[in-house]
């Protein structure tokens, strides 16, 4: 596996010249490419953990740690005059949960991946599940937290399901997140379903 510096140089870039935002998106690609060839855990018994929310938090540091390269990447950034904590600050907070049960669900799927248990989390892909508070004209207002960007940890799939209602049908599509266990050769998935806005009269 190439180092992050080699990965950056292969794209004809110099780590010292990049902004924290540019470094973050390159690290995102670097980690996803490292995780992509890992096979899905396919042991005979399988656990499905279904939850309305998964409070997974930011994923960059956790994925670097689980791949066993956090210290190496941190040192490479420091050698280039960059701070990994400042790069981590660029990452948007996934709006997939905001409570203790969501945190518990995330801990379970992380633990299953690290213990080598074949398991998948199943939940909803909230595009604006959290909100941020801002002040306008000396008044506090809530704004949606748009966390899904063109480049994100989400891996799109071709899987979809029709969900019929009385007067209309929604198509639910499936995206997933790779859940990496600590220094494991296999991975699990967090499967997230979403739809387009429902039709209104």
Segments (PLM) and residue ranges:
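Glycine- and acidic
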Residues: 12-17, 86-96
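Conserved small/polar residues in nucleotide/adenosyl-binding loops
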Residues: 194-201
């Amino acid at each position: 596996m190439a180092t992050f510096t080699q990965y950056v140089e292969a794209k004809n870039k110099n780590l010292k010249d990049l902004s924290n935002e540019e470094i973050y998106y390159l690290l995102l690609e670097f980690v996803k490419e490292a995780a992509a060839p890992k096979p899905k855990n396919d042991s005979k018994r399988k656990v499905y953990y279904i939850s309305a929310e998964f409070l997974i938090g930011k994923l960059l540091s956790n994925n670097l740690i689980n791949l066993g390269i956090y210290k190496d990447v941190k040192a490479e950034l420091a050698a280039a005059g960059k701070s990994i904590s400042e790069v981590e600050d660029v990452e948007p907070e996934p709006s997939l949960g905001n409570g203790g049960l969501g945190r518990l669900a995330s801990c379970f799927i992380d633990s299953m991946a690290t213990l080598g248990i074949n398991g998948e989390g199943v939940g909803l892909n909230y595009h604006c599940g959290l909100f941020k508070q801002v002040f306008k004209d000396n008044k506090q207002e809530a704004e949606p937290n748009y966390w899904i960007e063109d480049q994100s940890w989400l891996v799109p799939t071709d899987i979809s399901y029709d969900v019929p209602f009385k007067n209309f049908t929604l198509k639910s599509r499936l995206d997933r997140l790779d859940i990496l266990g600590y220094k494991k050769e296999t991975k699990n998935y967090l499967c997230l379903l979403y739809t387009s806005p429902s039709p209104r009269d």
